[in-house]
């Protein structure tokens, strides 16, 4: 990539991002037939919800439409279920897709059990929609809720909550129907279901990793007591109660608010919302309970086109960092940090080669076997965040676990590097100047200022894209999204500690494995594998055990393992950037500074966060 080509490549990247973001927005609005608007809803105790309102133009005061509240699960924002919002709104249903409390742009909650006691905010949305005259284009007798995982728990809790309220007041339930995806082990006792006067649909992954918590310890719902209670709650005469469920069969009557159906698709828990069969089943359910006529076929789906477009934007936005940085390095103030690329390292031979692979294995094993222990340690060190209480002391429960793992592995990597260099490398032709560590204090400061500028430009473009098109950069649930200003404070809190890992990775890749300055794909792939193999080993252990025994290897820690679906791709591609930035500057510092700021802000803005109100 030559200096003369940098402006053209940068312009090309920005153009691609704009074009595919516009296309994603076009799909999201159903080719202009649905208006998508971000709204803020004030709720109890000074709390608030951020939400996206999908209003079909066919929904009017003369022709009011049913409404569905979409509730993402734990660690998810409203964008992660935009596919469902798109398909429901295409079929004439008004959708309010919320950021659950303590996630996305919504505030924290004073409740430590927000999904159960507040429906992650859904209770307040239903109350508002039912009571206000502002939403005169919705049919208040047909308000539904749906959610995945913990969002599914919120949905069934809503059916119980509004059922109790209706019986107490002698009225009908405000919640006409609920659809619960990916959650069944809580919220379905006889006590929970007794007051429900809403239709209920269930979709549960046959290969759900959390199925060990179910009564029968697996995901097959045909004989599951939890699912049987759901179906039998619609049958008044106990003599007619069933002992085995027919998957996909509708029981009960929608008009009497006792319709029940159970789906059991062959899919894993985290990928359940992004499956066409799962989507079709849920669309069929809402068409049935709302008695919709002349709607689109359930298999007529367009949501994946948006995912393709935002995926392209995601990838290109990260590629854009390279020409952007090269262009910025041509500014005289920053040009001073560029140094000649150090001589390549001598390839290890004999004992050196053996030592190289021993250290490679040690690093991988340490990475693999410290992740779950660090996750458990985070619960002890960060008690308030782990208890879902509002706090300024590292308020991100799940990222705290990743942070501890990153610190430990970063320190271990630095120790291994220093020890191998002192005991072996220094004596076998590895000079200090080959490592890319030598830098003046003034140059280090300029490097840091450049990283901040790259970070700012990157996110300014993202905010502009979101303002223009109301989409972000996203591959399913892996997203780079806009953030609240308070997240900049958290970046100052978290980034320095994560930086230990990022710097150690840059040093490892460029200071111990740079046997060539030619960035061939096989070299980059090896570097990516070297960085991520420990975490990949965790995923392999988890799912090989799961498919052989029916139970995941780490049960109580399965949600932490699920985090790795988003973390591993980031870790794998990290060396790609560290290699390129090293080639630009001749030092190991710029790469980890830029990637730490960009990637950690992505982590911070996509997780639960218990910041005080």
Residue ranges and their predicted role:
Residues 22-25, 322-326, 367-376:
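Alpha-helical transmembrane segments of multi-pass membrane proteins
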Residues 358-613:
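Alpha-helical transmembrane segments of integral membrane proteins
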